[in-house]
Amino acid sequence: MKNQGRLAQNSDECEAKYIYIQDLPSKCNDDLLEKCDTLNKWLNMCEYLTNSGLGPRLNYSTSWYATNQFSLEVIFHNKMKQYRCLTNISSKASAVYVPFYAGLDVGRYLWDDDDIKIRDNASIQLVEYLKEKPEWIKMGGHDHFLVAGRVSWDFRRQTDSVSDWGNTLFNLLEVKNMTSLVIESSPWSNIDFAIPYSTYFHPSSDDEIYVWQEQMRQKHRPNLFSFVGAPRVQLRDSIRNEIINQCLGSKGKHCEFLKCDGIIKNCDEPKNVMRLFKRSVFCLQPPGDSYTRRSTFDSILGGCIPVFFHPASAYVQYLWHFPKNYTSYSVFIPMEDVNKGDFAIEKRLLEIPKEKVVAMREEVIKLIPKVIYANPSSKLERFEDAFDIAVKGVLSRIEGIRMDMLRGNNNNNSNFESFPEEYSWKYNFFGGLENLEWDSYFSRG
């Protein structure tokens, strides 16, 4: 597949920013799109992969789409084709983008107890192909990056049992040399980095963002807090049931609950979800099947202050996109507090001074451009979107590794120092290993 898009014209503005798109066999991307009806056991993905991966346009706006949360690698690829510093001379590039649709590939097999060789086949063939390319030899793959539009755990199968989850993409030695972008990273790894889930809003101009931000500032928010989701009865440690009970039992009728289940399909309609977020001051974001939720980014888009219960739901994930000062834009309530049974979320939120709430909401609204992916067919002039920030993060990381290799240090750490990989979350967020604040959340003993 020929992947080159708009090539850079001005070499000065692109110094240290050039990216080369690696040509891959069509089975790595285009063929998957052609077989879109086979990509998900429960859902026909074909309509969601239209419009450059944005999905079908919603009736009520030209910039709103029914975007599927697992179509990010297609969106990213189409935006990369319009990247202003593309080059078709690989030796000139600071980074090499590998447009393998890893998430679409593995999604075909996640719920099947098939031969694990089928799950791993495309990933193994990819690295065998890359190793033979001259671009790989330059840095042994350390300057390569890919986007896998699912959570990290889908690519980290721990055993060769057919009942174990996922494939082994991130376990391959060659891929460990690369930088992988996912919608949820492993806190104990230094090869994958989280970037925002896609929202429904894909503006084509800066003015659309300005208008939306101002609308969110002016919104009347009758709900103190809200929750969009479903119970997790099968997850023993889940706090969702307690959160739902507290929302439904709010003494001042301060909470609104939008139940997501397979019968009513309330949450499949973007208008329902966004309506609730726009009516709420705070939006509860407990872990679900994994640490993170697409709902976090939809709520930010709605100007709603997120409330997190685990630091891996946002703080140690989206290091390039969210402020390090997490109290400026969110509320953190430890999971163990909620599990005590006598802790009232409503009371905790009511204790926050009004002026603090106003300041937090403004920070959330400022985050909106950073968590949306603008329409690939357009270019923002004054804002950097989630794609722009991710590319800057990748280039910075690769440059650091390149300088490290020149100094003779080849540890592949994003902060260019040697530390145990299991403490990646701590080093990347706190800048060192001494802080003990969140150790209990990440202990694997």
Predicted regions and their residues:
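Signal-peptide-cleavage-adjacent N-terminal segments of secreted and extracellular proteins
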Residues: 1-91
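Short, solvent-exposed loop/turn segments at secondary-structure junctions
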Residues: 26-28, 101-105, 151-154, 200-202, ...
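Catalytic binding pocket for nucleotide-activated donors in carbohydrate/polymer assembly enzymes
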Residues: 272-372
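Conserved donor-binding/catalytic core segment of Leloir-type glycosyltransferases
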Residues: 219-232
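C-terminal amphipathic helix plus adjacent low-complexity
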Residues: 9-15, 331-445
